[in-house]
Amino acid sequence: MRRRRRRDGFYPAPDFRDREAEDMAGVFDIDLDQPEDAGSEDELEEGGQLNESMDHGGVGPYELGMEHCEKFEISETSVNRGPEKIRPECFELLRVLGKGGYGKVFQVRKVTGANTGKIFAMKVLKKAMIVRNAKDTAHTKAERNILEEVKHPFIVDLIYAFQTGGKLYLILEYLSGGELFMQLEREGIFMEDTACFYLAEISMALGHLHQKGIIYRDLKPENIMLNHQGHVKLTDFGLCKESIHDGTVTHTFCGTIEYMAPEILMRSGHNRAVDWWSLGALMYDMLTGAPPFTGENRKKTIDKILKCKLNLPPYLTQEARDLLKKLLKRNAASRLGAGPGDAGEVQAHPFFRHINWEELLARKVEPPFKPLLQSEEDVSQFDSKFTRQTPVDSPDDSTLSESANQVFLGFTYVAPSVLESVKEKFSFEPKIRSPRRFIGSPRTPVSPVKFSPGDFWGRGASASTANPQTPVEYPMETSGIEQMDVTMSGEASAPLPIRQPNSGPYKKQAFPMISKRPEHLRMNL
């Protein structure tokens, strides 16, 4: 049976675009509060007098107010007594999760300092490879800016970022559930309630990005990861665009063709509505086994996206059919989600009528698939061609010039959650002595090509405000049952039963007919 080809995904590829598979990454850059100077001699003397009063029947320790305690700032520097130096040696390599032209992604265990013993994914990128291509530098910059700004239950977290002379290291949360793509590969297609769950969580992540003025532009199964419970985590922010608010458009041609909105292909100017088209294309992929418009090559695929009818299988419910038609409208202005309500418009559709949005955001809704994991280190949801390799981080034998390294200024990061976990270990009850302050493929996504070399890592509004051209409108027609081609398999596609949580191992490929997915979209096994 022919099967899907793995497309650009999360852990399986550290390089940014033209590669076998692609992983998530994000780079933070925050300025940690600097520790205050050491206490003065007067303060130390005062502390000495306090101890002396205790020794001679003075006030008891629990009679002191907080005014007798010295306050100090919790920061990476202060809690680690002059800071914990995050470096490659802080992590033990466990498995290879992915490999690409720019480096590797490892499963690692932290062996020193805060988070000792915890499992992470470590993405290693070669600086020399990144700086050779302005587009790849732009991808890194976009991910850094966005993941610095957004924190959401359905968006991936980055814990640490650091660098050596020739490499960048990104320490990410380990998402042991693997890619949503792998679930589609196993099941062939999803039942509507399964698709509804994933689409609902994804819509909340997209809505959060849009509130921040960010459009995603590369929604596809490979960029959606699952955590150990089976909840969605949106990854890979290299093609995002910032500062896109109401009335603002951008003209960059980028994305993955099969999921790209018509206005991107026509270069007529686009806004956040492109993400709702992509959600519709993803929904169609989940329910039918392939994106809505595919061709033998990119040109034919683009022609179909711009001109062809939307064929809807007869087994889809009326709610699913209606949502697909409203999301896959070629006229962006009339597309569901394009209005001021954004994600709220999509979430109010009857297809999501059974979703409790508050419980979903709190991750209290049980996912349809819960990964069967044996331990925290389980890598069964990742490609064995990587995980069976011996993990080796090659020597850092290359360095950049001082001017080239300027691109990576502000790279180092420690997540606030790490500082909070350390802060909890400190008691703020009054002490006898006040605490002292410490001293010191055809599926290759199309990348954006706009990049200002002098911009580097700084933030700022860069959105184009040019008036969009008026796009040529082709009517979107939908087919009836008579247009369904069922001759190849002798039967029409239909939803399949799926494994319920905790009811047994995952099924293997279950699609009952020859896959409708084009050869270049299938996994090579």
Curated annotation (Swiss-Prot):
GO biological process: apoptotic process; behavioral fear response; cellular response to dexamethasone stimulus; cellular response to growth factor stimulus; cellular response to insulin stimulus; cellular response to nutrient; cellular response to type II interferon; G1/S transition of mitotic cell cycle
UniProt protein name: Ribosomal protein S6 kinase beta-1
UniProt family annotation: Belongs to the protein kinase superfamily. AGC Ser/Thr protein kinase family. S6 kinase subfamily.
Phenotype upon changing residue 167 to N: Greatly reduces activity. Greatly reduces phosphorylation at T-412 and moderately reduces phosphorylation at T-252
Tissue localization of expression: Widely expressed.
Species assigned in the record: Homo sapiens
Subcellular location(s) per record: Synapse, Synaptosome; Mitochondrion outer membrane; Mitochondrion
Purpose of the protein: Serine/threonine-protein kinase that acts downstream of mTOR signaling in response to growth factors and nutrients to promote cell proliferation, cell growth and cell cycle progression. Regulates protein synthesis through phosphorylation of EIF4B, RPS6 and EEF2K, and contributes to cell survival by repressing the pro-apoptotic function of BAD. Under conditions of nutrient depletion, the inactive form associates with the EIF3 translation initiation complex.
Keywords: Acetylation, Apoptosis, ATP-binding, Cell cycle, Cytoplasm, Kinase, Membrane, Mitochondrion, Mitochondrion outer membrane, Nucleotide-binding, Nucleus, Phosphoprotein, Serine/threonine-protein kinase, Synapse, Synaptosome, Transferase, Translation regulation
